[in-house]
Each structure stands twice: as structure tokens, then as C-alpha cells.
Amino acid sequence: MSMQDPIADMLTRIRNGQAAKHVSVKMPSAKLKIAIAKMLKEEGYITDYAVADEAKPELEITLKYFQGQPVVETIQRVSRPGLRIYKGKNELPKVMGGLGVAIVSTSQGLMTDRTARQNGMGGEVICYVA
């Protein structure tokens, strides 16, 4: 059986892993998943990520906690296969009043909502993280 929405699966694995206080979570790897993991690391929501080069590459994300509590409060899929959400440069949302980030897929690749606003670009809103 094929997976319908691999990005939603990735976000759910992160959410469930932190709820269960796991050190890390593993999932099938893909270029978009690696790009999202890179952004989460740059923004300080995860400790690290690694890709195991095997017959079926696996992405392992090391989760981050602060004083025993998960750093990620909410992680939510916005644009999905059945309903794509596109926003222009002036319509990009501020997650939690600017405390969180929205990951946006633009013509120049994935970037945060802040970076997209600075570059004057809009795109598909992949997810919200706070």
C-alpha cells in the first residue's frame, strides 16, 4: 500500500515521538523530507538529522527537549495533496505572532515565512511549526 501524504506522515512521526519522549524517530527518506528536517534544525526545533544510505534510505531525526518538555509545541500540515494552499508574499501567515515558523515551498526551494517575505516571494505553505 502506498503512502498518500509522506510529509504528513513525517510530521506525525515527529509529533508522536515527542509525545512519547523518544530520543529519535526514523522514517523513509526523500529529498523534500530532508529539506524540511534541515529547516527544522536551522530553526532549533530538532537536535540533528541523518540519512542512512542503504537499499531503502532512512531519515533519522533526533528530537529536542528543554527541561524535559518537547521543544515543538505544535507541528501542523497546511497544504495537502487534496487541498493545496498557496499564499502570495503579502499573505504569508505569521505563526503564533511571529514566534513560530511556516515552511514555504517557493520557486527557489524551501524557506521559512520570514525568509520568503524578505525575498519578496510567495509559495505553497507546507506546514506550521511552533
UniProtKB/Swiss-Prot annotation:
One of the record's GO cellular component terms:
ribosome
NCBIfam families per UniProt: PRK00136.1
User: Subunit structure, briefly?
Assistant: Part of the 30S ribosomal subunit. Contacts proteins S5 and S12.
Q: Does this UniProt record's set of keywords contain RNA-binding?
A: yes
Membership in a protein family:
Belongs to the universal ribosomal protein uS8 family.
- Asked if the keyword Signal belongs to this entry, the reply reads no
Query: What's the source species for this entry?
Result: Shewanella pealeana (strain ATCC 700345 / ANG-SQ1)
Q: Please report the name of this protein according to its UniProt entry.
A: Small ribosomal subunit protein uS8
Which terms under GO biological process does the entry name? translation
Q: Which gene encodes it?
A: rpsH
Task: Write down the InterPro entries for this protein, in alphabetical order.
Answer: Ribosomal_uS8, Ribosomal_uS8_CS, Ribosomal_uS8_sf
Signal peptide stretch: none
Q: Which UniProt keywords apply?
A: Ribonucleoprotein, Ribosomal protein, RNA-binding, rRNA-binding
Superkingdom is Bacteria
Function as written in the Swiss-Prot or TrEMBL entry? One of the primary rRNA binding proteins, it binds directly to 16S rRNA central domain where it helps coordinate assembly of the platform of the 30S subunit.
Offer an example of a GO molecular function term for this protein: structural constituent of ribosome
